[in-house]
Amino acid sequence: MYNLSILETQKAIKFIKDLFQVNLAHALKLHRVTAPLVLERNKGINDDLNGSENPVTFTSDGNGISGEIPQSLAKWKRMMLGKYEIPLHEGIYADMNAIRKDESLSSIHSIYVDQWDWELHIKKTERNLETLKVVVKKIYEIIRLCQKEVNKKYEWFAENLLPEEITFISSEDLLQRYPNKTPKERERLIASKYKAVFIIGIGDNLSDGKPHDLRAPDYDDWKLNGDIIVWNETTKSALELSSMGIRVDEVSLVEQLDKSNNNSRKELDFHKKLINKEFPYSIGGGIGQSRLCYFLLHKQHIGEVQSSLWPKDILEEAEKNNIKLL
């Protein structure tokens, strides 16, 4: 297969990003908004993702302010739905750039994260699996559209097409199917079989007493969330492209804070307002920009489609394998 040069790769990245965001905005009726690069500290707005990852923080001494770099914008977006008075069944999306300093680095994990962060205003009565599945299918169709257009533009990629439909499976059903496997092994097995899956229910304990994966307790409802995972034929592995979910309401927030021993968060501004029903009900998520490009362009390493910071061993390994990191 022909390998794109660095310049050709940069052009292809722009092509994919332009195509995806236009179709995402149209399909979900999203308005583009400007994402913050810094957030106020100690307000509960930033996300600790799996519950333990700490954001990069700083103090501007001369200005008397302190801030932190976003890790994701899940809670910020929900606040903005209200602040911007976004109508029902419309939403927002932003180009989110984040630093996750505690990330374990790999060929698909970087401390730099770029994604389309989106949030859609829904009714409380729409907080259900049917709503979740409808939105997942729309996003999956856009991923398939992008794959078709990329393969048309770069003809040597015209192989290993994603299936027409995405397969839904709950994390509990996945556990029952592969009881002696780890969650990551289960993901690999189910992705290799169906090529595109959405695993429902991430964060809460399963019947074996452990969660499929960790999720912070204060943005997704653990019963109504999940991940879009595809089979990456280039690397023969499962690849998560998007994490999304129906957001917590005033009841599920309290339940999940209690389950995760995070009741102290009820005193933070964001959590107080949510418990008092001051924010719109919503569904939202993030779609990895670099991951999508990495997948569609058949790359070996995420660093081929994004500029980040890498330790010496990863740089040496890439050079040895003739992988050109940006």
Swiss-Prot record:
Its EC number is 6.3.1.1. Pathway: Amino-acid biosynthesis; L-asparagine biosynthesis; L-asparagine from L-aspartate (ammonia route): step 1/1. The keyword Transmembrane does not apply. Pfam families: AsnA (PF03590). Keywords: Amino-acid biosynthesis, Asparagine biosynthesis, ATP-binding, Cytoplasm, Ligase, Nucleotide-binding. It is an enzyme of class 6 (ligase). This is Aspartate--ammonia ligase. NCBIfam families: asnA. GO terms for cellular component: cytosol. The keyword ATP-binding applies. Belongs to the class-II aminoacyl-tRNA synthetase family. AsnA subfamily. InterPro entries: aa-tRNA-synth_II, aa-tRNA-synth_II/BPL/LPL, AsnA. It is found in: Cytoplasm. It catalyses: L-aspartate + NH4(+) + ATP = L-asparagine + AMP + diphosphate + H(+).
